[in-house]
């Protein structure tokens, strides 16, 4: 994981975008270190019964799949969600060991690193996201960094509630 303190004074745009996404991904994985399979499935926030550490990791994995493979590449959407259960990736995560979910997230991230390396940042997504808008790869990288960082905050809260870990 790249730390904030080892950021060089000058990076090109691609390096900035990919490094900060990788930092956020690494933070998500680090928050799960040492968490038992049982604890990873605990919903500790009464107002968010689907929010578990396993659910968040599975969500992050499938969010990357959706934005890179479905929106950017235009592949068929084979994600776990349905119209009847749009949050299914959060719900089904408790049926899998956290270690498996982390491995799948790492594999997905590695595939996407390769994809991003071979594309221009201004390459447009095959699918429109709304109102006919085709976002570019740059936007997708920024969005995934924001989404991952936001959920890292949720992982922070869950981890602290589980065992008091705050770093």
What is each PLM-predicted segment?
Residues 2-8, 14-87, 127-167:
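Short, contiguous alpha-helical
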């Amino acid at each position: 994981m790249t730390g904030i303190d080892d950021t060089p004074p000058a990076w090109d745009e691609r390096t900035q975008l990919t490094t900060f996404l990788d930092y956020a991904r690494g933070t998500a994985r680090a928050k799960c270190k040492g968490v038992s399979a049982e604890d990873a499935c605990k919903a500790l926030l009464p107002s968010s019964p689907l929010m578990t550490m396993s659910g968040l990791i599975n969500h992050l994995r499938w969010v990357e799949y959706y934005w890179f493979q479905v929106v950017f590449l235009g592949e068929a959407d084979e994600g776990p969600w349905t119209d009847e259960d749009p949050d299914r990736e959060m719900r089904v995560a408790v049926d899998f060991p956290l270690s498996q979910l982390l491995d799948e997230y790492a594999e997905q991230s590695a595939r996407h690193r390769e994809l991003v390396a071979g594309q221009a940042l201004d390459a447009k997504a095959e699918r429109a996201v709304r109102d006919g808008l085709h976002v570019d790869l740059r936007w997708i990288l920024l969005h995934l960094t924001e989404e991952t960082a936001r959920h890292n905050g949720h992982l922070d809260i869950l981890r602290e509630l589980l065992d008091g870990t705050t770093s």
